Amino acid sequence: MGKSVVVLGAQWGDEGKGKIVDLLTDRVKYVVRYQGGHNAGHTLIINGEKTVLRLIPSGILRENVTCLIGNGVVLSPTALMQEMGELESRGINVRERLLISEACPLILPYHVAMDKARESALGNKAIGTTGRGIGPAYEDKVARRGLRVGDLFDKQSFAEKLKNILDYYNFQLVNYYKVEAVDYQKTLDEVLAVADIITAMVADVTTILDVARKNGDNILFEGAQGTMLDIDQGTYPYVTSSNTTAGGVSTGAGFGPRHIDYVLGIIKAYCTRVGGGPFTTELFDEVGAEIARKGNEFGAVTGRPRRCGWFDAVAIKRAIQTNSISGFCMTKLDVLDGFREVKICVGYKMPNGEIAEYAPLAAKDWEGVEPIYETLPGWQENTFGITDVNQLPENTRNYIKRIEEVTGVPIAILSTGPDRVETMILNDPFAV
C-alpha cells in the first residue's frame, strides 16, 4: 500500500520544507502543492548547487516524480513562465512533468498593484506581505469574480472578463489609493502570450490523486508558509491568505482527509518570523543577532531579514492541534552550536497572570504575553553535517529529547545542514 504524507511548516514558515520535500521525493510518484503561490521560497541545495522554487513543487528536481499544482494554489502566469524557464535552461523537463488544476485562481498585474498599494497605505501597520498579489487573488476567488486557469481556454471570453474586473480594480487604485491604473491591453497580451503553454498542462488533479491512491502510489503534499500564518488558525491579521494547515490538502487538492496517512511538521531548532505580527520568544540582543547570522536568516523570495527567537513549544502545541502532526523534522540544529545555554518556551504568562499552554489565535490576545523558559545547557561541539544521531553531543540529544517531551510528538528527521545528505531519518514517514 502506498502512503500519503503531508509536509508542512509548524511555525511561521521558512522552516526548511523544500530540502525535506526534496529528500523524501525519492520515495514518491507525485508531489503536490495545495495552497499559497509564488510567495513561497523553497530553497534546495543539491551537490552544492542552489535552487529556489517558488511555485513549482520541489519534486521537479527528481526525474521520476510528477508534480501537481492543486486548485488551492494562486497561480501567476508570469512567475510560472520565469520559473519554468530557469529550470528548463538547466535541462530539467518541466512541461511533461507538471500538471495544473484548471480551478487555480490567476494572479494578474492588478493583484500585485493592489497588494503594494494597500501595504503602502498601511505604513507602519502593514501586514508585511511579499507584495506579489497573493491576498487580492484569494479575495477574488472568495468573491467569485476571479479569473482562473480554466478561463484561458476561451480567449475571447477571458478578454471580456478581464476588462470588467480591471475596471473594478483601476477605479480603486486611481481614486482611493491615488496610484497609476493597470493597462488592460498590456495585461491581456502578456497573459494570452503564454495561455497555450499553461492550458497544455491542465489536468484533473483530484482524479489523478484518487487513482494514484488506489494504485498504491506514494504521494507527498508540499505545504507553503507555516501553520502560524494560516488565514484561520494563525496570528490574524498577521497571516497569509490561504490555509497552510493540513486541512488545506483536502480543500486545495481535492484529496479526502481520511486518506492522509502521516503529517510531518517541519520545525527549526529555534524560531523565526518575517514581517509584522506577534512573536513571543523574539530576541533583540546579541544572541538573536548571532542566530540570524549563523542561520543566514533572510527570506528566500524577498531577501528580508527574519526575526529570530528561542524555540516556542506553546506555539508548536497549537500547530500540533490544528494539523494532527504525526512527527517532526527539526532543521538547522547546527545553528545552535556554540551557545552556552539554549532555551525552550514552555508556557505563556498572560497579562491577567494566568499561564497558557497553547498559543492564542488573534494577534491582539498576544499583547503583553511573557514567555516562560526552561534553560538547558548548550553545546560547544560542531554538529554540522552529522548523519548519525549517536554522534551528536549529549546536550544536543537532551535538547531534542526535551522538545519531544514538552510537545508530546517524536522527532522523525533531523537536519544538520542545507544539503539533502546532511540529514538523519530516524523514522521514515513513508515506512510507518
Curated annotation (Swiss-Prot):
Cofactor field: Mg(2+)
**Which residues are connected by disulfide bridges in this protein?**
none
- What does the record's cofactor remark say about binding? Binds 1 Mg(2+) ion per subunit.
User: Where does this protein hold substrate?
Assistant: A300, V301, T302, G303, R304, P305, R306
Subcellular location field: Cytoplasm
Q: Can you provide one Gene Ontology molecular function annotated for this UniProt record? A: adenylosuccinate synthase activity
Q: Which reaction does it catalyse?
A: IMP + L-aspartate + GTP = N(6)-(1,2-dicarboxyethyl)-AMP + GDP + phosphate + 2 H(+)
Predominant location: cytoplasm
| Leader sequence segment | none
What GO cellular component term, any one, is given? Answer: cytoplasm
Q: Which residues bind GTP?
A: 13-19, 41-43, 306, 332-334, 415-417
A Pfam family annotated for this chain is: Adenylsucc_synt
EC number from the UniProt entry: 6.3.4.4
The UniProt record gives the binding positions of Mg(2+) as D14, G41
Pathway assigned in UniProt: Purine metabolism; AMP biosynthesis via de novo pathway; AMP from IMP: step 1/2
Residues at the active site? D14, H42
Example GO BP: 'de novo' AMP biosynthetic process
The entry's keywords = Cytoplasm, GTP-binding, Ligase, Magnesium, Metal-binding, Nucleotide-binding, Purine biosynthesis
Q: Which PROSITE patterns does the entry mention?
A: ADENYLOSUCCIN_SYN_1, ADENYLOSUCCIN_SYN_2
Which enzyme type, at the first EC level? ligase
Looking up Gene3D superfamilies in the UniProt record yields: Adenylosuccinate Synthetase, subunit A, domain 1, Adenylosuccinate Synthetase, subunit A, domain 2, Adenylosuccinate Synthetase, subunit A, domain 3
The UniProt entry, under NCBIfam families, shows: PRK01117.1, purA
Q: What does this protein do?
A: Plays an important role in the de novo pathway of purine nucleotide biosynthesis. Catalyzes the first committed step in the biosynthesis of AMP from IMP.
User: What name has this protein been given in UniProt?
Assistant: Adenylosuccinate synthetase
